[in-house]
């Protein structure tokens, strides 16, 4: 029949018209925006928490703590940062409070610290001093160093210890280990000893001004299997 087009010509026309429906560029219509990177992981997969670390992160989240997981690192022989976090605000019974000058700590240390801060410090502040806790000041955590006067690595070299120097209350008072341990009011002295004793129930090693002169200005809180409190 005159005017009829061969079937091959019609098929080619259909294919070409379908190509015009594809978006411009070299992408197909199935391309999608990559999903967001989960918190605590890297796009390259350089940071993968251990199973224990993942479980601990879930437990730490349950305390209401603000934190960010950090990449693992081996800085020197005996100096490691494994399953560590950068710890921000913590949750008290009725309000949140901040943490000052704290470096990387293991998740287990952070979780223990969060429980102590809420149940041992915030509550003691309200009972003994009549004010809620606003901030805990520290002298740091991770440090690649030995125990003073020895060749043994400190717990600080594994990010498993925190040195606490003072507590700031919502009413503006600052209760410092140095000065108030022996020189504070009766309520302040009682408060500092209560928080020390509470820490002894949670941490493996707790050192206070009663231990030696090197700890006259802070409480050393260290996780572990040991049981030493002074």
Predicted features by range, described:
Residues 24-25, 30-32, 82, 86-88, ...:
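Catalytic cores and adjacent binding grooves of peptidoglycan-active enzymes
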Residues 27-55:
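Post-signal peptide N-terminal segment of mature Sec-exported envelope proteins
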Residues 1-9:
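Bacterial N-terminal signal peptides that target proteins for export
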Residues 41-47, 103-112, 150-151, 177-186:
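Second-shell loop/turn segments in exported
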Residues 15-18:
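C-terminal motif of bacterial Sec signal peptides marking the signal peptidase cleavage site
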Residues 20-22:
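A eukaryotic "domain-start" boundary segment
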Residues 127-159:
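Active-site-adjacent substructure of cysteine-protease-like catalytic cores
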Residues 48-136:
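Active-site acidic/histidine clusters and adjacent loop/turn architecture
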